[in-house]
Protein backbone atom coordinates (compact mmCIF):
# COMPACT_ATOMS: atom_id res chain seq x y z
CA UNK A 1 0.00 0.00 0.00
CA UNK A 2 1.42 3.33 -1.05
CA UNK A 3 2.25 5.81 1.65
CA UNK A 4 -0.28 8.62 1.99
CA UNK A 5 0.68 11.92 0.44
CA UNK A 6 1.49 14.50 3.11
CA UNK A 7 0.23 17.90 2.23
CA UNK A 8 1.72 20.99 3.85
CA UNK A 9 -0.48 23.29 5.81
CA UNK A 10 -1.88 26.01 3.64
CA UNK A 11 -0.90 29.46 4.87
CA UNK A 12 -4.00 31.60 5.32
CA UNK A 13 -4.11 34.82 3.42
CA UNK A 14 -3.52 37.79 5.74
CA UNK A 15 -6.54 39.89 6.52
CA UNK A 16 -6.58 43.56 5.66
CA UNK A 17 -4.13 45.14 8.15
CA UNK A 18 -5.88 48.53 8.15
CA UNK A 19 -9.61 47.91 7.65
CA UNK A 20 -10.75 51.15 9.28
CA UNK A 21 -8.56 53.33 7.11
CA UNK A 22 -9.66 51.39 4.03
CA UNK A 23 -13.31 51.80 4.98
CA UNK A 24 -13.03 55.53 5.63
CA UNK A 25 -11.07 56.19 2.45
CA UNK A 26 -13.69 54.24 0.51
CA UNK A 27 -16.47 56.31 2.07
CA UNK A 28 -14.71 59.57 1.25
CA UNK A 29 -14.00 58.44 -2.29
CA UNK A 30 -17.63 57.44 -2.87
CA UNK A 31 -18.90 60.69 -1.38
CA UNK A 32 -16.53 62.74 -3.56
CA UNK A 33 -17.70 60.75 -6.59
CA UNK A 34 -21.35 61.46 -5.82
CA UNK A 35 -20.67 65.19 -5.40
CA UNK A 36 -18.46 65.19 -8.53
CA UNK A 37 -15.43 66.49 -6.65
CA UNK A 38 -11.96 65.97 -8.03
CA UNK A 39 -10.74 64.77 -4.65
CA UNK A 40 -12.08 61.35 -5.61
CA UNK A 41 -8.89 60.78 -7.58
CA UNK A 42 -6.79 61.61 -4.50
CA UNK A 43 -8.75 59.18 -2.33
CA UNK A 44 -8.59 56.46 -5.00
CA UNK A 45 -4.81 56.70 -5.34
CA UNK A 46 -4.36 56.72 -1.56
CA UNK A 47 -6.68 53.72 -1.21
CA UNK A 48 -4.73 51.77 -3.81
CA UNK A 49 -1.47 52.55 -2.02
CA UNK A 50 -2.88 51.59 1.38
CA UNK A 51 -4.17 48.21 0.18
CA UNK A 52 -0.67 47.29 -0.97
CA UNK A 53 0.87 48.04 2.42
CA UNK A 54 1.12 44.79 4.47
CA UNK A 55 1.64 46.24 7.98
CA UNK A 56 -0.84 47.84 10.38
CA UNK A 57 -0.76 51.59 10.93
CA UNK A 58 -1.45 53.02 14.36
CA UNK A 59 -2.32 56.56 13.26
CA UNK A 60 -2.91 58.66 10.21
CA UNK A 61 0.44 60.34 10.74
CA UNK A 62 2.20 57.02 10.18
CA UNK A 63 0.49 56.73 6.79
CA UNK A 64 2.66 59.56 5.52
CA UNK A 65 5.31 57.02 4.59
CA UNK A 66 2.95 55.76 1.88
CA UNK A 67 2.63 57.24 -1.56
CA UNK A 68 -0.21 59.73 -2.18
CA UNK A 69 -0.64 60.46 1.56
CA UNK A 70 -0.10 64.14 2.31
CA UNK A 71 -0.62 66.30 5.38
CA UNK A 72 -4.30 66.97 4.73
CA UNK A 73 -5.26 63.34 4.23
CA UNK A 74 -3.26 62.15 7.26
CA UNK A 75 -4.93 64.82 9.37
CA UNK A 76 -8.36 63.67 8.19
CA UNK A 77 -7.54 60.09 9.18
CA UNK A 78 -6.32 61.15 12.63
CA UNK A 79 -9.45 63.22 13.26
CA UNK A 80 -11.71 60.40 12.14
CA UNK A 81 -9.75 57.95 14.30
CA UNK A 82 -10.13 60.24 17.32
CA UNK A 83 -13.88 60.46 16.75
CA UNK A 84 -14.03 56.69 16.43
CA UNK A 85 -12.24 56.20 19.75
CA UNK A 86 -14.34 58.84 21.50
CA UNK A 87 -17.53 57.09 20.42
CA UNK A 88 -16.36 53.86 22.06
CA UNK A 89 -14.76 52.08 19.11
CA UNK A 90 -11.61 49.99 19.24
CA UNK A 91 -8.46 51.93 20.03
CA UNK A 92 -6.47 50.17 17.33
CA UNK A 93 -7.03 51.53 13.85
CA UNK A 94 -6.60 48.06 12.38
CA UNK A 95 -9.64 46.76 14.24
CA UNK A 96 -12.43 45.57 11.97
CA UNK A 97 -15.04 47.44 13.91
CA UNK A 98 -15.67 51.02 13.06
CA UNK A 99 -18.21 53.72 12.83
CA UNK A 100 -19.88 54.67 9.61
CA UNK A 101 -20.04 58.43 9.60
CA UNK A 102 -19.78 60.82 6.71
CA UNK A 103 -16.48 62.40 5.88
CA UNK A 104 -15.93 65.86 7.34
CA UNK A 105 -16.87 68.32 4.63
CA UNK A 106 -14.44 70.95 5.84
CA UNK A 107 -11.45 68.75 5.12
CA UNK A 108 -12.20 67.65 1.59
CA UNK A 109 -10.59 70.68 0.03
CA UNK A 110 -7.45 70.23 2.13
CA UNK A 111 -6.39 67.13 0.24
CA UNK A 112 -6.32 68.75 -3.16
CA UNK A 113 -2.52 68.73 -2.96
CA UNK A 114 -2.11 65.67 -0.77
CA UNK A 115 -0.73 63.63 -3.64
CA UNK A 116 2.32 65.86 -3.85
CA UNK A 117 5.48 64.18 -2.51
CA UNK A 118 6.71 65.26 0.91
CA UNK A 119 10.24 66.60 0.52
CA UNK A 120 11.50 66.01 4.03
CA UNK A 121 10.31 64.46 7.27
CA UNK A 122 10.13 66.74 10.29
CA UNK A 123 12.56 66.27 13.13
CA UNK A 124 11.60 65.81 16.72
CA UNK A 125 9.59 68.70 18.03
CA UNK A 126 8.72 70.03 14.57
CA UNK A 127 5.27 70.23 13.08
CA UNK A 128 4.50 70.01 9.40
CA UNK A 129 6.29 68.10 6.69
CA UNK A 130 9.05 70.55 5.72
CA UNK A 131 12.16 70.92 7.84
CA UNK A 132 15.19 72.43 6.07
CA UNK A 133 18.50 70.69 6.64
CA UNK A 134 21.14 72.29 8.82
CA UNK A 135 23.50 72.97 5.94
CA UNK A 136 20.92 74.34 3.52
CA UNK A 137 20.37 77.80 2.13
CA UNK A 138 16.68 77.63 3.04
CA UNK A 139 17.52 77.40 6.74
CA UNK A 140 19.83 80.42 6.49
CA UNK A 141 17.21 82.53 4.72
CA UNK A 142 14.52 81.71 7.28
CA UNK A 143 16.79 82.55 10.23
CA UNK A 144 18.00 85.81 8.66
CA UNK A 145 14.43 86.93 7.91
CA UNK A 146 13.42 85.85 11.42
CA UNK A 147 16.08 88.14 12.90
CA UNK A 148 14.77 91.01 10.80
CA UNK A 149 11.23 90.23 11.96
CA UNK A 150 12.32 90.43 15.61
CA UNK A 151 14.10 93.74 15.06
CA UNK A 152 11.79 96.45 16.54
CA UNK A 153 13.47 99.12 14.42
CA UNK A 154 13.41 97.11 11.20
CA UNK A 155 10.98 97.02 8.29
CA UNK A 156 10.19 93.27 8.67
CA UNK A 157 11.43 92.70 5.12
CA UNK A 158 14.75 92.55 3.24
CA UNK A 159 15.67 93.20 -0.34
CA UNK A 160 17.61 90.52 -2.19
CA UNK A 161 20.88 92.43 -1.85
CA UNK A 162 20.33 92.89 1.89
CA UNK A 163 19.45 89.22 2.24
CA UNK A 164 22.65 88.19 0.48
CA UNK A 165 24.75 90.55 2.57
CA UNK A 166 23.31 89.25 5.84
CA UNK A 167 24.06 85.67 4.82
CA UNK A 168 27.57 86.60 3.69
CA UNK A 169 28.21 88.36 7.02
CA UNK A 170 27.43 85.14 8.85
CA UNK A 171 29.96 83.20 6.80
CA UNK A 172 32.46 85.49 5.02
CA UNK A 173 34.73 82.63 3.99
CA UNK A 174 32.93 80.63 1.34
CA UNK A 175 34.80 77.86 -0.40
CA UNK A 176 34.67 78.22 -4.20
CA UNK A 177 32.42 75.66 -5.82
CA UNK A 178 30.79 74.66 -2.54
CA UNK A 179 27.35 75.90 -3.59
CA UNK A 180 24.71 73.39 -4.54
CA UNK A 181 22.31 74.07 -7.40
CA UNK A 182 19.10 73.82 -5.36
CA UNK A 183 17.38 77.24 -5.53
CA UNK A 184 16.72 77.82 -1.84
CA UNK A 185 14.93 81.14 -2.08
CA UNK A 186 12.67 79.98 -4.91
CA UNK A 187 11.84 76.83 -2.96
CA UNK A 188 10.72 78.87 0.05
CA UNK A 189 8.58 81.08 -2.19
CA UNK A 190 6.88 78.03 -3.68
CA UNK A 191 6.25 76.56 -0.23
CA UNK A 192 4.56 79.81 0.82
CA UNK A 193 7.09 80.32 3.61
CA UNK A 194 8.55 83.54 2.18
CA UNK A 195 6.52 86.35 0.62
CA UNK A 196 7.82 88.47 -2.27
CA UNK A 197 6.26 91.90 -2.84
CA UNK A 198 7.01 95.22 -4.53
CA UNK A 199 9.49 96.06 -7.28
CA UNK A 200 12.41 95.83 -6.52
CA UNK A 201 11.51 92.68 -4.67
CA UNK A 202 11.07 92.67 -0.89
CA UNK A 203 11.19 89.39 1.00
CA UNK A 204 9.45 88.71 4.30
CA UNK A 205 8.14 85.72 6.25
CA UNK A 206 4.59 84.48 5.87
CA UNK A 207 2.78 83.30 9.03
CA UNK A 208 3.75 79.71 8.15
CA UNK A 209 7.35 80.76 7.55
CA UNK A 210 7.45 82.69 10.82
CA UNK A 211 6.23 79.64 12.71
CA UNK A 212 8.83 77.40 11.07
CA UNK A 213 11.64 79.94 11.59
CA UNK A 214 10.78 80.18 15.28
CA UNK A 215 11.00 76.40 15.62
CA UNK A 216 14.30 76.39 13.75
CA UNK A 217 15.69 78.98 16.16
CA UNK A 218 14.48 76.96 19.14
CA UNK A 219 15.95 73.74 17.75
CA UNK A 220 19.37 75.39 17.47
CA UNK A 221 19.19 76.56 21.06
CA UNK A 222 18.72 80.20 20.12
CA UNK A 223 16.81 82.42 22.49
CA UNK A 224 15.37 85.83 21.79
CA UNK A 225 18.64 87.38 22.90
CA UNK A 226 21.06 85.45 20.75
CA UNK A 227 18.78 85.30 17.74
CA UNK A 228 19.38 89.02 17.57
CA UNK A 229 16.88 91.85 17.73
CA UNK A 230 18.91 94.32 15.75
CA UNK A 231 20.76 94.41 12.48
CA UNK A 232 24.13 94.18 14.23
CA UNK A 233 24.74 91.50 16.84
CA UNK A 234 27.67 91.30 19.25
CA UNK A 235 30.51 89.17 17.86
CA UNK A 236 30.18 86.53 20.53
CA UNK A 237 26.48 85.97 19.96
CA UNK A 238 26.36 85.48 16.21
CA UNK A 239 24.82 82.31 14.96
CA UNK A 240 27.21 80.30 12.84
CA UNK A 241 25.84 79.91 9.34
CA UNK A 242 27.45 77.25 7.16
CA UNK A 243 29.56 78.58 4.33
CA UNK A 244 28.00 76.24 1.82
CA UNK A 245 24.55 77.59 2.64
CA UNK A 246 25.61 81.17 2.04
CA UNK A 247 27.25 80.15 -1.19
CA UNK A 248 24.09 78.32 -2.18
CA UNK A 249 22.03 81.45 -1.69
CA UNK A 250 24.48 83.47 -3.73
CA UNK A 251 24.37 80.86 -6.47
CA UNK A 252 20.57 80.91 -6.50
CA UNK A 253 20.51 84.67 -6.90
CA UNK A 254 23.05 84.47 -9.68
CA UNK A 255 25.75 86.65 -8.15
CA UNK A 256 29.42 86.21 -7.41
CA UNK A 257 30.88 86.59 -3.94
CA UNK A 258 33.38 89.11 -5.30
CA UNK A 259 31.64 91.54 -7.70
CA UNK A 260 33.36 92.02 -11.02
CA UNK A 261 34.52 95.59 -11.62
CA UNK A 262 35.94 96.84 -14.92
CA UNK A 263 37.51 100.29 -15.04
CA UNK A 264 37.96 102.39 -18.19
CA UNK A 265 40.55 100.84 -20.45
CA UNK A 266 40.14 97.38 -18.89
CA UNK A 267 37.37 96.17 -21.22
CA UNK A 268 36.17 96.22 -24.80
CA UNK A 269 32.61 96.27 -26.12
CA UNK A 270 31.73 93.55 -28.62
CA UNK A 271 28.55 92.26 -30.23
CA UNK A 272 27.29 88.78 -29.29
CA UNK A 273 25.38 87.01 -32.06
CA UNK A 274 23.10 84.09 -31.26
CA UNK A 275 24.29 80.88 -32.88
CA UNK A 276 20.81 80.44 -34.35
CA UNK A 277 21.41 83.49 -36.54
CA UNK A 278 24.38 81.80 -38.23
CA UNK A 279 23.05 78.30 -38.89
CA UNK A 280 20.58 77.03 -41.42
CA UNK A 281 19.88 78.00 -44.99
CA UNK A 282 18.79 81.24 -46.52
CA UNK A 283 20.53 84.51 -45.71
CA UNK A 284 21.76 83.67 -42.19
CA UNK A 285 25.47 83.18 -43.04
CA UNK A 286 25.28 86.43 -44.98
CA UNK A 287 24.74 88.34 -41.74
CA UNK A 288 28.19 87.41 -40.43
CA UNK A 289 29.78 88.32 -43.73
CA UNK A 290 28.16 91.74 -43.58
CA UNK A 291 29.33 92.29 -39.99
CA UNK A 292 32.87 91.34 -40.98
CA UNK A 293 32.72 93.68 -43.96
CA UNK A 294 31.64 96.52 -41.67
CA UNK A 295 34.50 95.67 -39.25
CA UNK A 296 32.17 94.98 -36.33
CA UNK A 297 33.89 93.19 -33.43
CA UNK A 298 31.59 90.28 -32.68
CA UNK A 299 31.42 86.77 -31.27
CA UNK A 300 28.99 83.90 -31.87
CA UNK A 301 27.54 82.04 -28.90
CA UNK A 302 24.33 80.48 -27.63
CA UNK A 303 21.84 83.04 -26.32
CA UNK A 304 18.80 81.76 -24.44
CA UNK A 305 16.85 84.96 -25.11
CA UNK A 306 17.20 87.51 -27.88
CA UNK A 307 19.34 87.40 -31.01
CA UNK A 308 21.93 90.10 -30.28
CA UNK A 309 23.40 91.50 -27.06
CA UNK A 310 26.53 93.49 -26.29
CA UNK A 311 29.08 92.57 -23.62
CA UNK A 312 31.96 94.42 -22.02
CA UNK A 313 34.75 91.84 -22.05
CA UNK A 314 37.79 92.05 -19.80
CA UNK A 315 40.93 92.74 -21.87
CA UNK A 316 43.58 91.50 -19.41
CA UNK A 317 41.89 88.72 -17.43
CA UNK A 318 43.60 86.60 -14.81
CA UNK A 319 42.25 83.54 -16.61
CA UNK A 320 42.59 84.12 -20.37
CA UNK A 321 40.29 81.18 -21.07
CA UNK A 322 37.51 82.69 -18.94
CA UNK A 323 37.51 86.50 -19.12
CA UNK A 324 35.00 88.49 -17.11
CA UNK A 325 32.02 89.72 -19.13
CA UNK A 326 29.23 92.15 -18.29
CA UNK A 327 26.11 92.47 -20.45
CA UNK A 328 25.23 95.99 -21.53
CA UNK A 329 21.64 97.05 -21.01
CA UNK A 330 20.58 96.52 -24.66
CA UNK A 331 19.10 93.50 -26.44
CA UNK A 332 17.81 93.01 -30.00
CA UNK A 333 15.27 90.48 -31.26
CA UNK A 334 15.39 90.12 -35.06
CA UNK A 335 12.33 88.99 -37.01
CA UNK A 336 11.85 88.60 -40.72
CA UNK A 337 8.27 89.18 -41.83
CA UNK A 338 7.70 85.51 -42.65
CA UNK A 339 9.09 84.48 -39.26
CA UNK A 340 6.97 87.14 -37.55
CA UNK A 341 3.89 85.76 -39.29
CA UNK A 342 4.56 82.17 -38.21
CA UNK A 343 5.42 83.20 -34.64
CA UNK A 344 2.08 85.01 -34.31
CA UNK A 345 0.23 81.93 -35.55
CA UNK A 346 1.94 79.40 -33.25
CA UNK A 347 2.06 81.66 -30.16
CA UNK A 348 5.82 82.23 -30.01
CA UNK A 349 5.33 85.95 -30.56
CA UNK A 350 3.73 86.60 -27.16
CA UNK A 351 6.00 84.19 -25.32
CA UNK A 352 9.19 85.70 -26.75
CA UNK A 353 8.12 89.23 -25.83
CA UNK A 354 7.23 88.04 -22.33
CA UNK A 355 10.67 86.44 -21.89
CA UNK A 356 12.41 89.51 -23.28
CA UNK A 357 10.68 91.70 -20.70
CA UNK A 358 11.91 89.38 -17.93
CA UNK A 359 15.49 88.96 -19.14
CA UNK A 360 16.90 91.72 -16.91
CA UNK A 361 17.79 94.17 -19.72
CA UNK A 362 15.75 97.35 -19.99
CA UNK A 363 16.46 98.62 -23.52
CA UNK A 364 14.77 96.17 -25.87
CA UNK A 365 14.84 96.55 -29.65
CA UNK A 366 12.51 94.65 -32.00
CA UNK A 367 14.18 94.53 -35.42
CA UNK A 368 11.63 93.79 -38.17
CA UNK A 369 13.22 92.88 -41.49
CA UNK A 370 11.38 92.93 -44.80
CA UNK A 371 11.45 89.70 -46.79
CA UNK A 372 9.71 89.17 -50.09
CA UNK A 373 6.16 90.19 -50.78
CA UNK A 374 3.76 90.77 -47.91
CA UNK A 375 0.89 89.38 -50.00
CA UNK A 376 2.41 85.87 -49.95
CA UNK A 377 2.22 85.54 -46.16
CA UNK A 378 -0.41 83.67 -44.14
CA UNK A 379 -1.61 86.81 -42.36
CA UNK A 380 -2.73 90.10 -43.88
CA UNK A 381 -0.41 93.08 -43.77
CA UNK A 382 -2.75 94.94 -41.42
CA UNK A 383 -2.41 92.18 -38.80
CA UNK A 384 1.38 92.30 -38.95
CA UNK A 385 1.37 96.09 -38.73
CA UNK A 386 -0.94 95.95 -35.71
CA UNK A 387 1.32 93.41 -33.98
CA UNK A 388 4.39 95.59 -34.55
CA UNK A 389 2.54 98.69 -33.33
CA UNK A 390 1.39 96.89 -30.16
CA UNK A 391 4.97 95.82 -29.52
CA UNK A 392 6.07 99.44 -29.54
CA UNK A 393 3.11 101.15 -27.87
CA UNK A 394 1.94 98.56 -25.33
CA UNK A 395 5.06 96.50 -24.63
CA UNK A 396 7.45 99.46 -24.71
CA UNK A 397 9.92 98.00 -27.23
CA UNK A 398 11.83 100.18 -29.67
CA UNK A 399 10.82 98.94 -33.14
CA UNK A 400 13.24 99.28 -36.06
CA UNK A 401 12.21 98.28 -39.59
CA UNK A 402 14.85 97.45 -42.20
CA UNK A 403 14.61 96.65 -45.90
CA UNK A 404 16.95 93.64 -46.01
CA UNK A 405 19.72 91.84 -44.17
CA UNK A 406 22.36 94.33 -45.28
CA UNK A 407 20.45 97.18 -43.69
CA UNK A 408 20.01 95.08 -40.53
CA UNK A 409 23.77 94.50 -40.34
CA UNK A 410 24.39 98.22 -40.88
CA UNK A 411 21.99 99.03 -38.02
CA UNK A 412 23.79 96.57 -35.71
CA UNK A 413 27.12 98.13 -36.66
CA UNK A 414 25.73 101.57 -35.87
CA UNK A 415 24.45 100.38 -32.49
CA UNK A 416 27.79 98.73 -31.67
CA UNK A 417 29.78 101.89 -32.31
CA UNK A 418 27.22 103.98 -30.46
CA UNK A 419 27.45 101.76 -27.37
CA UNK A 420 31.24 101.84 -27.50
CA UNK A 421 31.09 105.64 -27.33
CA UNK A 422 28.32 105.62 -24.71
CA UNK A 423 30.21 103.41 -22.24
CA UNK A 424 33.60 104.95 -22.89
CA UNK A 425 35.07 106.21 -19.62
CA UNK A 426 32.56 104.32 -17.45
CA UNK A 427 33.39 101.98 -14.60
CA UNK A 428 31.31 98.81 -14.89
CA UNK A 429 30.40 96.66 -11.91
CA UNK A 430 28.39 93.46 -11.68
CA UNK A 431 25.08 93.42 -9.85
CA UNK A 432 22.92 90.57 -8.55
CA UNK A 433 20.22 89.11 -10.72
CA UNK A 434 16.82 90.67 -10.06
CA UNK A 435 18.10 94.06 -8.89
CA UNK A 436 17.63 97.15 -11.09
CA UNK A 437 20.63 98.65 -12.81
CA UNK A 438 21.72 102.29 -12.66
CA UNK A 439 23.50 102.96 -15.94
CA UNK A 440 23.03 106.70 -15.63
CA UNK A 441 23.78 107.17 -11.95
CA UNK A 442 26.52 109.62 -11.27
CA UNK A 443 26.86 110.69 -14.90
CA UNK A 444 26.79 114.36 -13.98
CA UNK A 445 28.60 114.24 -10.64
CA UNK A 446 31.60 112.04 -11.38
CA UNK A 447 34.18 112.07 -14.15
CA UNK A 448 34.17 108.27 -13.98
CA UNK A 449 30.47 107.23 -13.86
CA UNK A 450 29.55 103.84 -12.40
CA UNK A 451 27.25 101.40 -14.22
CA UNK A 452 25.87 98.25 -12.59
CA UNK A 453 25.32 95.43 -15.08
CA UNK A 454 24.60 91.70 -15.13
CA UNK A 455 27.36 89.23 -15.80
CA UNK A 456 26.91 87.30 -19.02
CA UNK A 457 26.71 83.96 -17.18
CA UNK A 458 23.93 85.26 -14.91
CA UNK A 459 22.04 86.79 -17.83
CA UNK A 460 22.19 83.65 -19.95
CA UNK A 461 21.45 81.27 -17.07
CA UNK A 462 18.44 83.32 -15.97
CA UNK A 463 16.96 83.20 -19.46
CA UNK A 464 17.02 79.41 -19.90
CA UNK A 465 13.69 78.42 -21.41
CA UNK A 466 13.52 74.74 -20.43
CA UNK A 467 14.80 74.93 -16.87
CA UNK A 468 13.01 73.12 -14.06
CA UNK A 469 9.69 74.82 -13.42
CA UNK A 470 7.45 74.98 -10.40
CA UNK A 471 3.74 74.15 -10.44
CA UNK A 472 3.04 77.89 -10.34
CA UNK A 473 5.13 78.52 -13.47
CA UNK A 474 3.60 75.61 -15.38
CA UNK A 475 0.13 76.79 -14.34
CA UNK A 476 0.89 80.27 -15.69
CA UNK A 477 2.08 78.82 -19.00
CA UNK A 478 -1.07 76.71 -19.18
CA UNK A 479 -3.27 79.76 -18.65
CA UNK A 480 -1.45 81.66 -21.39
CA UNK A 481 -2.54 79.03 -23.90
CA UNK A 482 -6.12 80.29 -23.52
CA UNK A 483 -6.99 82.91 -26.10
CA UNK A 484 -7.08 86.33 -24.48
CA UNK A 485 -4.88 85.49 -21.47
CA UNK A 486 -1.71 87.57 -21.69
CA UNK A 487 1.34 87.29 -19.48
CA UNK A 488 0.07 90.05 -17.17
CA UNK A 489 -3.34 88.40 -16.82
CA UNK A 490 -1.75 85.01 -16.13
CA UNK A 491 0.48 86.60 -13.48
CA UNK A 492 -2.54 88.18 -11.80
CA UNK A 493 -4.38 84.84 -11.82
CA UNK A 494 -1.51 82.87 -10.28
CA UNK A 495 -1.05 85.58 -7.66
CA UNK A 496 -4.59 84.83 -6.51
CA UNK A 497 -4.57 81.06 -7.18
CA UNK A 498 -1.00 79.77 -7.27
CA UNK A 499 -1.84 76.18 -8.30
CA UNK A 500 -4.59 74.47 -10.31
CA UNK A 501 -5.66 72.73 -7.11
CA UNK A 502 -6.34 76.04 -5.36
CA UNK A 503 -8.37 77.27 -8.34
CA UNK A 504 -10.38 74.05 -8.47
CA UNK A 505 -11.03 74.29 -4.74
CA UNK A 506 -12.35 77.83 -5.24
CA UNK A 507 -14.62 76.60 -8.03
CA UNK A 508 -15.86 73.74 -5.82
CA UNK A 509 -16.72 76.24 -3.10
CA UNK A 510 -19.05 78.14 -5.43
CA UNK A 511 -22.73 77.49 -4.81
CA UNK A 512 -23.99 77.80 -8.38
CA UNK A 513 -22.55 77.54 -11.91
CA UNK A 514 -23.27 81.25 -12.35
CA UNK A 515 -21.02 82.01 -9.40
CA UNK A 516 -18.29 79.87 -10.96
CA UNK A 517 -18.51 81.85 -14.20
CA UNK A 518 -18.00 85.18 -12.41
CA UNK A 519 -15.41 83.99 -9.89
CA UNK A 520 -12.41 85.47 -11.73
CA UNK A 521 -14.08 88.47 -13.35
CA UNK A 522 -12.98 91.03 -10.72
CA UNK A 523 -9.29 90.08 -10.55
CA UNK A 524 -7.16 93.17 -11.25
CA UNK A 525 -4.63 92.82 -14.07
CA UNK A 526 -1.79 94.88 -15.51
CA UNK A 527 -0.49 98.32 -14.70
CA UNK A 528 -3.94 99.89 -15.09
CA UNK A 529 -5.48 97.33 -12.69
CA UNK A 530 -8.40 96.54 -14.94
CA UNK A 531 -10.78 93.69 -14.23
CA UNK A 532 -10.23 90.38 -15.97
CA UNK A 533 -13.79 90.61 -17.25
CA UNK A 534 -16.81 88.26 -17.35
CA UNK A 535 -16.08 86.83 -20.81
CA UNK A 536 -12.63 85.51 -19.95
CA UNK A 537 -13.81 84.39 -16.52
CA UNK A 538 -16.58 82.36 -18.19
CA UNK A 539 -14.09 80.78 -20.61
CA UNK A 540 -11.78 79.70 -17.79
CA UNK A 541 -14.67 78.30 -15.74
CA UNK A 542 -15.78 76.23 -18.72
CA UNK A 543 -12.22 74.94 -19.12
CA UNK A 544 -11.70 73.91 -15.50
CA UNK A 545 -15.25 72.97 -14.49
CA UNK A 546 -16.37 70.89 -17.46
CA UNK A 547 -16.33 67.13 -16.85
CA UNK A 548 -17.06 66.15 -20.42
CA UNK A 549 -15.28 67.03 -23.65
CA UNK A 550 -15.09 70.72 -24.51
CA UNK A 551 -17.28 71.83 -27.40
Curated annotation (Swiss-Prot):
Positions annotated as active site in the UniProt record: 274, 277, 307
Which Gene3D superfamilies does the UniProt entry name for this protein? 3.40.50.10130, Crossover junction endonuclease EME1, DNA-binding domain (1.10.150.670), DNA polymerase beta, N-terminal domain-like (1.10.150.110), Winged helix-like DNA-binding domain superfamily/Winged helix DNA-binding domain (1.10.10.10)
Q: Please tell me where Mg(2+) 1 binds in this chain.
A: 274, 277, 307, 333
Positions binding Mg(2+) 2 in this chain are 277, 307, 333-334
Free-text function comment from the UniProt entry: Catalytic subunit of two functionally distinct, structure-specific, heterodimeric DNA endonucleases MUS81-EME1 and MUS81-EME2 that are involved in the maintenance of genome stability. Both endonucleases have essentially the same substrate specificity though MUS81-EME2 is more active than its MUS81-EME1 counterpart. Both cleave 3'-flaps and nicked Holliday junctions, and exhibit limited endonuclease activity with 5' flaps and nicked double-stranded DNAs. MUS81-EME2 which is active during the replication of DNA is more specifically involved in replication fork processing.
Family as reported in the entry's similarity comment: Belongs to the XPF family.
Q: What is this protein called?
A: Structure-specific endonuclease subunit MUS81
Q: Which organism is it from?
A: Homo sapiens
Encoding gene (name): MUS81
Amino acid sequence: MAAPVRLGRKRPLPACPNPLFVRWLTEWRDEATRSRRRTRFVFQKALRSLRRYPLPLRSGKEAKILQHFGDGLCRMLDERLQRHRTSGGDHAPDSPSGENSPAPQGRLAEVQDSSMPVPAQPKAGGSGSYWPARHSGARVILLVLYREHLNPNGHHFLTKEELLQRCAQKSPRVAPGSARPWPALRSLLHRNLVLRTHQPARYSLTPEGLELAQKLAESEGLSLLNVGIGPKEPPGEETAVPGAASAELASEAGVQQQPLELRPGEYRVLLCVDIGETRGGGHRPELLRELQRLHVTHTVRKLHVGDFVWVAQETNPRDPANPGELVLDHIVERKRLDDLCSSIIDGRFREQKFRLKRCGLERRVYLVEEHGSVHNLSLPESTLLQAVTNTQVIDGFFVKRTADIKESAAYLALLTRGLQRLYQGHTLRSRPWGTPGNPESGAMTSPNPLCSLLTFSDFNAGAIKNKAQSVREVFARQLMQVRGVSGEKAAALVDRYSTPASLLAAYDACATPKEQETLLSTIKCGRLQRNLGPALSRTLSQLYCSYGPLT
